[in-house]
């Protein structure tokens, strides 16, 4: 559901057929014809993308056929956010070797850099100096638990969902909209206070030196040495990291949104609409190859509203122009008139896919480390909450190595990074992720009626159970209880689908194997 988002072989009832094979790698070399953004207006634009990616999956993670819009989202102007380069000391090639270089300047990278600096490490932050542009939605209690409640700009005490009737499901959990500039300012302040350095540059590669240290190669062949490098540069990090071979194919959650001044808004501004799966365009025939979408609504006031049409997950990204068309059709059918558009949003979240190779020396964090919840698309709370512990582990590794009588840098015969990887992805975490991947594969197979039945059942679970599922706080054993409870209260049609899915989908056997691994 949102960067906040949610995510049977064949079942007997209304399960959609599998789509064909993905577009082949030459897709990268094509030109894409793009519809214009609503605010800018103008003619259709032709864009040629020339960026280099590690492979086809890396290209898909970066945005695939929707890459133009992903780049537009990244580069939206955010005047309230200060440039990182204006606040942090610039890193240069003549500086002493850094303990840690964090590659990537999103919330995950900045939080990890600040936490590592807080623990006494010399830290460098490297990446394009871009603002936070995504509209993050979070459960208020989770952000309060991180001490970041001051970064929430709007809170709805009531959260609701509509599935197939006008009677909402009351979720009874406060939901907040994160202020992008306040969160950016807070993380930047933490980096500044802990002495983190910064370089506004893309990273081309990471080289392991003969003494076991790492050399981060930036644009212009600028080489910066460090004792450890951690990649937090987003999903498309295949040039810098190795990922497990033979894992599940990555799926994608896409959403197109507008924040607008509107007339005849039908939603109560006191409530946040987590999902609205109702069919507002009556009688419309949905293509067999089209995934269902829902409306996500943040009413800032009775007339200023953020509407977002969201495809929970799909094997091939639902195009943004299709989502925009669906959103406008939905709003028109609801009688909503758009008077002024303040902002457009193009949200692209890869979900699922392979874990990083946990035997490699280079570390990862955030989305690059596959920390996105496979079944929901959430990641920011997990990244911010795990940054302190991860920074502590990295600090202990480096201090332990410094105290070694054999070497003052990381020796080539021993890979201490394995300890950090095991902290980030212990066997317990792999079991949980396998369960979520099983849920993602289930969602991918359901049509609109199946999804409605699934969520009707889901929100009948005890609050602590469904909240734990969304927040990744249920243990692997707790997830088994979740499955049993879900099965017990589900209608027979959903039970049959769950059984068939477990027995026939590869994610079922993978989940069982992970649960049996000690």
UniProtKB/Swiss-Prot annotation:
<keyword id="KW-0809">Transit peptide</keyword>
<keyword id="KW-1133">Transmembrane helix</keyword>
<comment type="pathway">
    <text>Carotenoid biosynthesis; alpha-zeacarotene biosynthesis.</text>
</comment>
<protein>
    <recommendedName>
        <fullName>Lycopene epsilon cyclase, chloroplastic</fullName>
        <ecNumber>5.5.1.18</ecNumber>
    </recommendedName>
</protein>
<feature type="binding site">
    <location>
        <begin position="100"/>
        <end position="128"/>
    </location>
    <ligand>
        <name>NAD(+)</name>
    </ligand>
</feature>
<keyword id="KW-0520">NAD</keyword>
<comment type="pathway">
    <text>Carotenoid biosynthesis; delta-carotene biosynthesis.</text>
</comment>
<keyword id="KW-0125">Carotenoid biosynthesis</keyword>
<dbReference type="GO" id="GO:0016860">
    <property type="term" value="F:intramolecular oxidoreductase activity"/>
</dbReference>
<dbReference type="GO" id="GO:0031969">
    <property type="term" value="C:chloroplast membrane"/>
</dbReference>
<dbReference type="InterPro" id="IPR010108">
    <property type="entry name" value="Lycopene_cyclase_b/e"/>
</dbReference>
<keyword id="KW-0413">Isomerase</keyword>
<dbReference type="Pfam" id="PF05834">
    <property type="entry name" value="Lycopene_cycl"/>
</dbReference>
<keyword id="KW-0150">Chloroplast</keyword>
<feature type="transmembrane region" description="Helical">
    <location>
        <begin position="469"/>
        <end position="489"/>
    </location>
</feature>
<comment type="function">
    <text>Catalyzes the single epsilon-cyclization reaction which converts lycopene to delta-carotene and neurosporene to alpha-zeacarotene. Required for lutein biosynthesis.</text>
</comment>
<dbReference type="GO" id="GO:0016117">
    <property type="term" value="P:carotenoid biosynthetic process"/>
</dbReference>
<dbReference type="InterPro" id="IPR036188">
    <property type="entry name" value="FAD/NAD-bd_sf"/>
</dbReference>
<keyword id="KW-0934">Plastid</keyword>
<keyword id="KW-0472">Membrane</keyword>
<comment type="similarity">
    <text>Belongs to the lycopene cyclase family.</text>
</comment>
<dbReference type="GO" id="GO:0016705">
    <property type="term" value="F:oxidoreductase activity, acting on paired donors, with incorporation or reduction of molecular oxygen"/>
</dbReference>
<feature type="transmembrane region" description="Helical">
    <location>
        <begin position="435"/>
        <end position="455"/>
    </location>
</feature>
<keyword id="KW-0812">Transmembrane</keyword>
């Amino acid at each position: 559901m949102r960067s906040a988002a949610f995510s049977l072989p064949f079942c007997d009832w209304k399960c959609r057929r599998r789509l064909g094979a993905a577009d082949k790698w030459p897709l990268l070399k094509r030109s894409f014809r793009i519809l214009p953004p609503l605010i800018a207006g103008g003619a259709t634009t032709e864009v040629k993308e020339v960026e280099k990616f590690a492979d086809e999956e890396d290209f898909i993670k970066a945005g695939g056929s929707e890459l133009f819009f992903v780049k537009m989202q990244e580069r939206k102007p955010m005047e309230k956010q200060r440039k990182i380069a204006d606040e942090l000391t610039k890193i240069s090639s003549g500086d002493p070797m850094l303990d840690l270089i964090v590659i990537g300047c999103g919330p995950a990278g900045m939080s990890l850099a600040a936490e590592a600096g807080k623990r006494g490490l010399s830290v460098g932050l490297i990446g394009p100096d871009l603002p936070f542009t995504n509209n993050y939605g979070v459960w208020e209690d989770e952000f309060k638990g991180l001490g970041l409640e001051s970064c929430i700009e709007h809170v709805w005490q009531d959260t609701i969902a509509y599935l197939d009737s006008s009677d909402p499901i009351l979720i009874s959990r406060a939901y907040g909209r994160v202020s992008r500039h306040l969160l950016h300012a807070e993380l930047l302040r933490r980096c500044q206070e802990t002495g983190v350095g910064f370089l506004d540059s893309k990273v081309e590669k990471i080289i392991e030196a003969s003494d076991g240290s790492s050399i981060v190669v930036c644009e212009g062949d600028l080489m910066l040495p460090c004792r450890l490098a951690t990649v937090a540069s987003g999903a498309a990090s295949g040039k810098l990291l190795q990922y497990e071979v033979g894992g599940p194919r990555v799926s994608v959650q896409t959403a197109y949104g507008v924040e607008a001044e509107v007339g005849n808004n039908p939603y109560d501004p006191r409530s946040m609409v987590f999902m609205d799966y109702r069919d507002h365009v009556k009688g419309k025939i949905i293509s067999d190859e089209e995934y269902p979408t829902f409306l996500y609504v943040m009413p800032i006031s009775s007339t200023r509203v953020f509407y977002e049409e969201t495809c929970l997950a799909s094997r091939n990204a639902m195009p943004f122009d299709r989502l925009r068309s669906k959103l406008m059709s939905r709003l028109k059918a609801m009688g909503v008139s758009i008077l002024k558009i303040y902002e457009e949003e193009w949200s692209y979240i890869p979900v699922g896919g392979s874990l990083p190779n946990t035997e490699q020396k280079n570390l990862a964090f955030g989305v690059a480390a596959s920390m996105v919840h496979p079944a929901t698309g959430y990641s920011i709370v997990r990244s911010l909450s795990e940054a302190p512990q991860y920074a502590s582990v990295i600090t202990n590794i480096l201090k332990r190595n410094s105290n070694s009588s054999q070497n003052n840098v990381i020796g080539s015969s021993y890979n201490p990074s394995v300890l950090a990887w095991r902290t980030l992805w212990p066997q317990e975490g792999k079991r949980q992720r396998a369960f979520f991947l099983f849920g993602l594969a289930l969602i991918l197979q359901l049509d609109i009626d199946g999804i409605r039945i699934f969520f009707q059942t889901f929100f009948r679970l005890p609050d602590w159970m469904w909240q734990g599922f969304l927040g990744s706080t249920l243990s692997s054993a707790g997830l088994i209880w979740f499955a049993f409870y879900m099965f017990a209260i589900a209608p027979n049609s959903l039970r049959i689908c769950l059984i068939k899915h477990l027995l026939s989908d590869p994610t079922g056997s993978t989940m069982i194997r992970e649960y049996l691994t000690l």
